[in-house]
Structures are given as structure tokens and as C-alpha cells.
Amino acid sequence: METIRKLSEKNRDINAKPAVAIAFLGDSVTQGCFEVYTTETGGIETVFDAENAYHTHLRKILNTLFPAAALNIINAGISGGCARGGLERIERDVLRYSPDMCVVCFGLNDTGNYGIEEYKAALTGIFDRLLKEGVEVIFMTPNMMCTKISCHIKEENIRKVGEDILNNQVSGKLGQYLEAAKKIAVSKNIPVCDCYSKWKTLENSGVDTTELLANHLNHPTRDMNWLFAYSLVETMFEN
């Protein structure tokens, strides 16, 4: 990808080339959310830990490969975010920074909030807006959500949320949304970093993927964020 070429050139000559910027537009996983808990007022809140989010790991990898190249990360993830909201805030949260590349990752919340046609329309709008501004794009599919209600979830309000999330996963709804999204990306020559398929491979090989979720709902553990990072590096070098 052009962004890899820019990193390589910056690494060779730190004075002649500008710093590289990569934006990440997505939901809670992109923002860096992990465990959840019940607040004093009965609401549900999440633990924020962006230092262990996948884009932080990606930066570490790229800094290892191109140690002299300045790399700026733009975290445009918002907990609870959907593709529709991403399109609405793309100017404020992404384009104003003129990134060289943007990784787009939506789907987890979309299945519970919007129909598939709205999801497809919003993603199409995001892709078109980025491409119009000359920003390289990668569409990254998310992790799997829970395939059972974990015994680790004790609070009834969180278990209730988990039931809806579980249904969207085991019914095949999330997979349906992501297949549609991948087709849109391919039609626009946008590389797809298909992490969802890797999670499905783990499940089909007997791995309890629900145990790989920090909140046992839809946020991957800190260690599993490395899967996103390494997968993105592969995508960046292979396209």
C-alpha cells in the first residue's frame, strides 16, 4: 500500500518527508474498551484502555519495522458507535487531520441498531468520502461476539444485554452484515482485513471464543487485540 511506501521513505530520510498519519474509524473496540461493569446508578459502563487497543499494537509493530519514521495514530473510535454515526462524524474525527490511511471497522453495534440496508449505505458513504479525499482505506471486519451467556456474567442487566448480542451472533446476522460490507469494499478496490473469518476459524477448531472476550460480550481481550494488529500489518504489506 502507498502508506507503507511513505513509511519506508520517511524512514530513509526523516527530513525530506512528512510524518505519516493513520486514522481508525470504528466503535468501542477501536476506542479501546474492554471489561464492563454496573455503575452505582444501575447503568452499564466500560473500562477504557486505549494503550491496549489494536492500533496501539499496530503502531509498535510499524515502529519496529520503520524506527525512524514518525507515525501519528488518530483514534476515531467511539463506544457504541455504528457506521451511520461514523459517516456523520467523519469530517470532525478523521478528515480534518488529513490522514494518509483510514482503517474502518463497524458491524458489532449495527446489527442491533440498524437494518442491513442502512448499514450498507452508511459504509458506502464512508468509503466514498475517504476515497474522494485521497485517503487509502482498509475495511477490517470485527471479532465474533459471544456464542453463549458466560458464567462469568453475574449481573442480570448485563446478562440481558448479552442475550441480544448472543442472538445477533448465533443467528448469523453479524456474518450477513459483514459479507455485505466485504462485497462493497471489494467493489471499490478497498482491501479487506478479514479478522472475523479468523475468529470463525478459531471457533470451528474448538476454541471457546466467548472466553476471548474481555467483557464476555463483544470486546476482545487485550491479548486478542494483537490479532487485529498483525492482520492489519499483513494487509498493508500484501496490497
Show the residue positions of the predicted features:
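Cell-envelope and extracellular/periplasmic
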Residues: 28-29, 38, 42, 46, ...
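Structural motif
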Residues: 80-88
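Serine-esterase "nucleophile elbow" of acetyl-processing enzymes
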Residues: 1-76, 89-98
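A short helix->loop->beta-strand "cap" motif at the edges of active sites that frequently abuts
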Residues: 132-137, 190
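Extracellular glycan-modifying ectodomains
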Residues: 92-100, 108-111, 116, 129
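Catalytic His-Asp segment of secreted/periplasmic serine-dependent ester chemistry enzymes
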Residues: 144-239
